[in-house]
């Protein structure tokens, strides 16, 4: 199973040429604002760049190790939880409001270019040592359990209603500061 097969299934692309050697994006694909390719054993989202109108992407519970969202500037919701991501660049997604990237292998996560972010779930990224949410003033929900954070500053997140940083966060990871 791969992303290309999913896109064919949805009617977002067509294979043309000898043995489907070329692919074209269909009108339905060009207009697509939502893609849910979760739980399909997909290892790569190569081709996601051909969907610039994309607002919602759910690619959770796959085997994705890299994710290039630089050509998806309208992305509002992203769930890439349960993959093999070591890095995630959301700096080109300035209207992103919900980011779920739990259960990956992230070592860093920068959200300073996502001022509209209201939901951030980044739990179970055991190598994640730093998280700066001071540039996310609209953040209402932050779940960052089971990481390696040593400090967390939420003093700028005045809208915060839900903060989950438990499950050994303080004891196991020696949390030094929580503002």
Predicted regions and their residues:
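N-terminal capping/linker segments that flank leucine-rich repeat
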Residues: 1-56, 73, 94, 115, ...
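Residues on the solvent-exposed faces and adjacent turns
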Residues: 71, 92, 103, 113, ...
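Consensus "Asn ladder" position of solenoid repeat domains
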Residues: 40, 62, 83, 104, ...
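Intrinsically disordered, low-complexity coil segments
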Residues: 15-24, 123-127, 166-176
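Conserved hydrophobic beta-strand positions in leucine-rich repeat
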Residues: 33-37, 57-59, 76-80, 97-101, ...
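Conserved hydrophobic position(s) of the canonical leucine-rich repeat
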Residues: 32, 54, 64, 75, ...
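Canonical leucine-rich repeat
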Residues: 45-48, 67, 88, 109, ...
């Amino acid at each position: 199973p791969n992303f290309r097969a999913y896109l064919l299934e949805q009617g977002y692309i067509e294979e043309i040429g000898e043995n489907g050697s070329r692919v074209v994006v269909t009108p339905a694909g060009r207009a697509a604002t939502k893609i849910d390719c979760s739980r399909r054993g997909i290892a790569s989202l190569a081709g996601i760049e051909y969907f610039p109108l994309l607002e919602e992407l759910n690619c959770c519970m796959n085997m994705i190790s890299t994710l290039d969202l630089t050509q998806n500037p309208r992305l509002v919701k992203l769930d890439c939880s349960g993959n093999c991501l070591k890095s995630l660049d959301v700096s080109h997604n300035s209207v992103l409001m919900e980011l779920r990237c739990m259960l990956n292998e992230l070592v860093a996560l920068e959200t300073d270019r996502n001022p509209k972010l209201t939901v951030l779930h980044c739990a179970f990224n055991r190598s994640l040592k730093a998280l700066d949410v001071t540039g996310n003033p609209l953040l209402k929900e932050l779940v960052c359990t089971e990481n390696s954070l040593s400090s967390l500053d939420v003093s700028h997140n005045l809208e915060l209603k839900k903060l989950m940083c438990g499950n050994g966060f303080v004891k196991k990871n020696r949390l030094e500061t929580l503002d």
